[in-house]
A protein has these predicted regions:
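A detector for short, charged/polar N-terminal pre-domain segments
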Residues: 1-4
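Core-facing hydrophobic residues within beta-strands of well-ordered domains
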Residues: 6-9, 93
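Short alpha-helical segments used as structural interaction elements across diverse proteins
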Residues: 7-8, 53, 106
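Short aromatic/hydrophobic contact patches that present stacked aromatics
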Residues: 11-13, 48, 95-97
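Core segments of cupin and vicinal oxygen chelate
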Residues: 15-66
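Vicinal oxygen chelate
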Residues: 19-20, 41, 75-119
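A short, polar/proline- and glycine-enriched secondary-structure boundary/capping micro-motif
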Residues: 68-73
């Protein structure tokens, strides 16, 4: 497989230091609609804002996130699972999610693993 059929950006997830101020800025100042939000029990919170055209901007707030950390943020395992090591710092990008056909996700994962990407 050489080509991934990516149909745009689904969402971008960033890490913030203050969720209340972040929500206030994106809703009250920029006028974005808060589409969903939920608690990550014992870890923090996750919220999404509508950017239009099917794209969203997501923010994590982690209760133990460092103020800053060099490199790319990552969560080896699923956030909130109690396993893995969250290394997302305030002001970092946690992940970028693309719109892809859900039927093809397993094949795409297999293809990137074969290219040496750790998942």
């Amino acid at each position: 497989m050489n080509k991934f059929e990516i149909n745009g950006v689904h969402h971008l997830a960033l890490v913030c230091k203050d969720m209340e101020r972040t929500v206030e800025f994106y809703t009250d100042v920029l006028g974005m609609r808060l589409t969903k939000g939920f608690d990550l029990e014992g870890y923090g919170q996750h919220f999404f804002f509508d950017m239009g055209n099917g794209s969203e901007l997501g923010f994590f707030w982690f209760n133990d996130a460092p103020l800053s950390q060099p490199g790319v943020a990552s969560a080896k395992n699923i956030v909130g699972s109690g396993s893995g090591n969250i290394t997302s710092a305030h002001g970092s990008m946690n992940h970028l999610a693309f719109n892809v056909d859900p039927v093809k996700i397993a094949n795409y994962r297999e293809a990137i693993v074969k290219k040496g990407v750790q998942c």
